[in-house]
Amino acid sequence: NPLASPDVIGITSGASAAAVLFLWLGGVTGTSLLLAPVAMGGAFVVALGITALAWQKGISPARLVLVGVGLAAGLTAVTTLLLVLSPDATAMNAYIWLTGSLYASQWHDVTALAPWLMVCWPLALIKLRHLDAQSMGEDMALGLGSALQGHRLLFLMLAVALAGSAVAYAGAVGFIGLIAPHMARRLVNSGHTGLLPIAALIGALILLYADWVGRVAFIPRDLPAGIFVAGIGAPFFVYLLYRLRRELG
């Protein structure tokens, strides 16, 4: 589905809601080391909820997106309510994380992310041929021997693990997961084995560029990278909706 991305289907919203709830319950002091695991746990809980609600003799990509959009809206409302009820210091700390920024990132964050990448990335690359088969349609995938629902569930969990870990340490930077794959498809006319690394590289470059602009364009102010990414991603999302409507007639 061209509209499916972690922020659209609610994975990012789940991580955000869990992080803000944690800050609201525990305050600001001493929470930085636990914030990332809590956010990652929130992403997995939401993913399980989406899977359960969207399951009807298997997972339908269209149904998955619809359920995810609904959950994302509800979780955004919960997050907003928690921010309103939070003390000013807690709300400010949560706001910085919610907008997405590399400002407080340290090398120990890279060390914490490494195990997720070392496990999830090779597994994703090994299984990508099944994603190529599924992109040709359900009947073709079944004919080629792909376990349709099992692999869909596996790819969903891998996506949650990779996206959730990134959100946990960089904050809720929206639309990168939507923009990068579409840009990669324009550059790489091949299967997912070549597409995935290029999309990951493009996503990283977008985030680094947005972070650089936020640091140097408004000196002495330091604006979060998520603001600039959202400024590009929101119009791009509208464009995808328009293009999808035309394709569907």
What does each model-found stretch correspond to?
Residues 1-249:
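Alpha-helical transmembrane segments in inner-membrane proteins
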